[in-house]
Amino acid sequence: MVALRLIPCLDVANGRVVKGVNFVNLRDSGDPVELACRYSDEGADELVFLDIRASVENRNTLVNLVSRTAKSVKIPFTVGGGIDSVSSINDLLRAGADKVSLNSSAVINPDLISESSREFGNQCIVIAIDARRKVDKVGEWEVYVKGGRENTGIDVLSWAKKVEELGAGEILLTSMDGDGTQNGYDLHLTESVANIVDIPVIASGGAGSLEDIYDVFKEGRASAALLASLLHDKKLTLKEIKTFLLEKKLPIRPYE
C-alpha cells in the first residue's frame, strides 16, 4: 500500500511565510527556508510552497526561493504561484523543485497542463483547485482563481476530471470555506473528488486536530494532507501526528 503523506504548506508573500483565515487577514509566520528545514527535520514527507501573491500581481514565483530550499532540504517539494508557461516550469525544476503547482494559469490555458505533462512527465505537474461551496447547493463547489479572489463559475468536480484527462499527476484541493479555520477538512468535497479521479488528491484547508487528519484519510480518501496553521502555530508537531496515525493503523512513514 502506498504511504499516506503529511505535507506542510508554506504560503509565501513578499518573501515571508504568511497564514490567514479564508484566504484573508494574513499574519507573518516566518522565513520560508528556515521553516522548510524545520519541517524536514521534524519528519515531513514533502513540502509545498505557494506564492499567494504571484498570480494576483502577475509575476513569477521566485526561482531564488526554490534554489535556496533545494540546497537546504532533502525531501521533495512543490512550488506554485504565477507559473504560466513551460519555460517557467523548466526554470523552477532546474532550480531544484520536484513538482510545480498550476492554478489560475491552468484555468486560463488548459493546454498548459498537457504541454507541461508531455515535456516533464505528469509526476511533476500538480493542479491546485481552490474550491468554495455554492450557496444553498449541497454537494456543489465552484473553482476560484487569482488567489481565491475570482469565481470562475466552473464546477469543481468537472474541472478535477478534466485536469486528470489533460495529464495532471496530482490534485491539490483546497476548501476555501475551511482554509485557516482549524475546524476540520471538508470531507464531502475531498471524498467527492477522490471518488471520480484516479490520481492522488492532496486535501487542504481546515486541519485543526489529530482526528481531523485521520478523518480526511479514512473518510475523505485523501492521499495526502496539507498542514499549515496547526503546525505554524505549534498546536501539533509532525511527530505527534505520525504517532497518532500509526496507532490508528494507517500506512504512514514512521517518524525518524
Swiss-Prot record:
Keyword Magnesium: no
GO biological process terms, semicolon-separated: L-histidine biosynthetic process
Pathway: Amino-acid biosynthesis; L-histidine biosynthesis; L-histidine from 5-phospho-alpha-D-ribose 1-diphosphate: step 5/9
Catalytically driven reaction(s): 5-[(5-phospho-1-deoxy-D-ribulos-1-ylimino)methylamino]-1-(5-phospho-beta-D-ribosyl)imidazole-4-carboxamide + L-glutamine = D-erythro-1-(imidazol-4-yl)glycerol 3-phosphate + 5-amino-1-(5-phospho-beta-D-ribosyl)imidazole-4-carboxamide + L-glutamate + H(+)
Gene3D superfamilies: Aldolase class I
Catalytic class of the enzyme: lyase
GO cellular component, as recorded: cytoplasm
InterPro entries, per the entry: Aldolase_TIM, His_biosynth, HisF, IGPS_HisA/HisF, RibuloseP-bd_barrel
EC number: 4.3.2.10
Catalytic site: 11, 130
Keywords assigned by UniProt, alphabetized: Amino-acid biosynthesis, Cytoplasm, Histidine biosynthesis, Lyase
Gene Ontology terms, MF aspect: imidazoleglycerol-phosphate synthase activity; lyase activity
Compartments reported by the entry: Cytoplasm
PANTHER family (alphabetical): IMIDAZOLE GLYCEROL PHOSPHATE SYNTHASE HISHF (PTHR21235:SF2), IMIDAZOLE GLYCEROL PHOSPHATE SYNTHASE SUBUNIT HISF/H IGP SYNTHASE SUBUNIT HISF/H (PTHR21235)
Subunit record text: Heterodimer of HisH and HisF.
Role summary: IGPS catalyzes the conversion of PRFAR and glutamine to IGP, AICAR and glutamate. The HisF subunit catalyzes the cyclization activity that produces IGP and AICAR from PRFAR using the ammonia provided by the HisH subunit.
Family recorded in the similarity comment: Belongs to the HisA/HisF family.
Record-given protein name: Imidazole glycerol phosphate synthase subunit HisF
Organism: Prochlorococcus marinus (strain MIT 9215)
